[in-house]
From Swiss-Prot:
Gene3D superfamilies: Aldehyde Dehydrogenase, Chain A, domain 1, Aldehyde Dehydrogenase, Chain A, domain 2. Signal peptide: none annotated. One of its GO terms (cellular component) is mitochondrial matrix. The gene is Aldh1b1. This is Aldehyde dehydrogenase X, mitochondrial.
């Protein structure tokens, strides 16, 4: 049932994105209390309790109340899942003998099922994660559907080539699947991150053991049921719920896992890289933290820059690895920009994420909530000027008022460390070379943005900024068509786009002796 009061254009403008929805389309009503249908481990296309029989609670961040309990997988369960994935990857198995085009058909079928259950999945995501329903439905689910369809199209187009070589030989290359892929996904975009990991792995013929975030397991488990319904053979996809130090570590350390892909904090990324090296030198893809700069030059469109820098930070409650968490503004426009930024932050609607006009929901859990408030206190202690927000919103749940700091110095911890919350620090700069040096003076390098009307300056910044993605006069434009990943301690490897397929295949060279070679 559609609610015609709340139209899509505001949300599309929020991210500068276009979706398959007409701007005249109304949002459907959410399901405020979606039924929890799955809470067990998904191994070999079957549902299982944890070997230990342990469970853990998943909490509604809007209220702080327990939604339900989910199986707590650990090393023993990971072993079972890896065994199932290895059997599914066995030479001559149904999955290995399946045509690449058929793998693409299965991924398209999965996209169809996600589209069919879009309202339910978006509602489940909002319940477990706390993000506004309109963002779950319009942005996240749109990206999920597109990533499965996009990678489905690549399934029979990612291939080797013939190579002319000297002598009486014929040579060609094969792009072969890596094998059993361990995947560990975060809680900030559960379904999106699941799609980013699963789609390229399956398109290229791998099998998967995925550990989902303990804060947000529900939507990933429901999607597991759709994987079975779509027709993927047993063992191709296995979903484990559990904690990072147990289930996640077991995947990273496992001697029969050929590759691990992780999205999360830089600190955990270091541990996973080390575990991979200490075990079987499994291939590693890491998409980690960020402290991304948004740079506003004096010639920028002021209204547009204020809007974009606001959403660059506050989108998804600030819980975004590529959030624009350092806003540098040229000195001549700094005070006007600051005033407009504070005004916009004060107007941001915080509240129940199931209400269709809500712009900001709660932080994902109590730990994250308290960590962010701690950084706000630290910023004040270090001498930054608190201009708005800085405290909890409401009496229950994990809500924080949109917070803006001025007078922030580069050596402050709120300027150097990833806060991962609705806290926007503003900085002043005078010269282009100065701001480039300051923007790059971080251990991170995930993303950056520049706002200017001068094309020469925009191109210069795009070359000078040390980041995997540079946006010009926009922010947070991430789609399945383009590679995404970081420089420095923001990770290694790329996800999405054609480049993202490389991480899931090995290139094999086959050379054949021939009796006579002709051109």
């Amino acid at each position: 049932m559609l609610n015609a009061r709340f139209l899509v254009p505001r949300l599309l403008c929020l991210q500068g994105r276009t979706t398959s929805y007409s701007t005249a389309a109304a949002l459907p009503n959410p399901i405020p209390n979606p039924e929890i249908r799955y809470n067990q481990l998904f191994i070999n296309n079957e549902w299982h309790d944890a070997v230990s029989k342990k469970t853990f609670p998943t909490v509604n961040p809007t209220t702080g109340e327990v939604i339900g309990h989910v199986a707590e997988g650990d090393r023993a369960d990971v072993d079972l899942a890896v065994r199932a994935a290895r059997e599914a990857f066995r030479l001559g198995s149904p999955w290995r003998r399946m045509d690449a085009s058929e793998r693409g058909r299965l991924l398209n079928r999965l996209a169809d099922l996600v589209e069919r259950d879009r309202v339910y999945l978006a509602s489940l995501e909002t319940l477990d994660n706390g993000k506004p329903f309109q963002e779950s439905y319009v942005l996240d689910l749109d990206e999920v559907i597109k990533v499965y369809r996009y990678l489905a199209g690549w399934a029979d187009k990612w291939h080797g080539k013939t190579i002319p070589m000297d002598g009486e030989h014929f040579c060609f290359t094969r792009h072969e699947p890596v094998g059993v892929c361990g995947q560990i996904i975060p809680w900030n975009f559960p379904l999106v991150m699941q799609g980013w990991k699963l789609a390229p792995a399956l398109a290229t013929g791998n099998t998967v053991v995925m550990k989902v975030a303990e804060q947000t397991p529900l939507s990933a488990l429901y999607l597991a049921s759709l994987i079975k319904e779509a027709g993927f053979p047993p063992g191709v996809v296995n979903i484990i719920t559990g904690y990072g130090p147990t289930a996640g570590a077991a995947i990273a350390q496992h001697m029969d896992v050929d590759k691990v892909a992780f999205t999360g904090s830089t600190e955990v990324g270091h541990l996973i890289q080390k575990a991979a090296g200490d075990s079987n030198l499994k291939r590693v893809t890491l998409e980690l933290g960020g402290k991304s700069p948004s740079i506003v030059l004096a010639d920028a469109d002021m209204d547009h820059a204020v809007d974009q820098c606001h959403e660059a930070l506050f989108f998804n409650m600030g819980q975004c690895c590529c959030a624009g968490s350092r806003t540098f503004v040229e000195e001549s426009i700094y005070h006007e920009f600051l005033e407009r930024t504070v005004e916009k932050a004060k107007k941001r609607k915080v509240g129940n994420p199931f209400e269709l006009d809500t712009q900001q929901g709660p932080q994902v859990d109590k730990e994250q909530f308290e960590k962010i408030l701690g950084y706000i206190r630290l910023g004040q202690k270090e001498g930054a000027k608190l201009l708005c927000g800085g405290e909890r919103f409401g009496e229950r749940g994990f809500f924080i008022k949109p917070t803006v700091f001025g007078n922030v110095q580069d050596d402050m911890r709120i300027a150097r460390e990833e806060i991962f919350g609705p806290v926007q620090p503003l900085f002043k700069f005078k010269k282009i070379e100065e701001v480039i040096q300051r923007a790059n003076n971080t251990r991170y390098g995930l993303a950056a943005a520049v706002f200017t009307r001068d094309l020469d300056k925009a191109l210069y910044f795009s070359q000078a900024l040390q980041a995997g993605t540079v946006w010009v006069n926009t922010y947070n434009i991430v789609t399945c068509h383009t590679p995404f990943g970081g420089f420095k301690e923001s990770g290694n490897g790329r996800e999405l786009g054609e480049d993202g397929l490389k991480a899931y295949t090995e290139v094999k060279t086959v050379t054949i002796k021939v009796s006579e070679k002709n051109s």
